[in-house]
Amino acid sequence: MTFAAIPLLQRSLPETFSDWLSPLLSDRYDPHLVPGNQKRGLLIGMGMTEKQGGSDVLSNTTRAEKSAEGFYHLIGHKWFFSVPQSDAHLVLAQAPAGLSCFFVPRLLPDGQRNGVHLERLKDKLGNRANASSEVEFFNACGWLVGEEGDGVRQILKMGGLTRFDCALGSHALMRRAYSVALYHALQRQAFGKNLVDQPIMRQVLGQMALRLEGQTAFLFRL
């Protein structure tokens, strides 16, 4: 998600966090719990989904109230909060002019923790190593990205690239699985022949290769 957020944040990162751009572009992972401008690399997550609406984000109830200092206070929840260990999240919340996108850091510029409370991690099926959580916002500080009421269009700039990253990840797993299967078939013998020389196994490997090449072509079209 971090790389998917970079094009949006390069154009629309709130001025308060302009010194985050350098670590945002880094390929380093920095686990330290310090403000983003003090890190060698950053993680960026996303918070859209709420329990009452699911994928219908227009029904979100998390609200954002503008403060005298120019940032917003977020009050509400997210049912799925992607990459909860991130240094900041892009979060959808209802502002006076409609659903808007906010940059919500884990730590405030002065180093204090933001009002983002992780409730629990999701017990997911599949990609368990990529954590998701439930979260509550208690007057969490968020900075507007773009304009009020333009939240869906803004966050989908990140969402579209995130889906492309997911497709690349799936393709990588397919290619790895095919490589392992082919290597095994080249080494393993049964009934006096290597498996790769057995007609049925050749058919299975051929089908795997065709599916893999089809997805490769599809990714290049994307």
Stretches with model-predicted labels:
Residues 1-32, 81-84, 212, 216:
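Internal helix-loop-helix
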Residues 110-112, 119, 131-162, 179-196:
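A glycine-rich, basic-preceded beta-loop-alpha segment at the flavin cofactor/substrate interface
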Residues 42-48, 73-75, 115-120:
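Short Pro/Gly-enriched beta-strand edge/turn motifs at strand-loop
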Residues 71-115:
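A short core secondary-structure module
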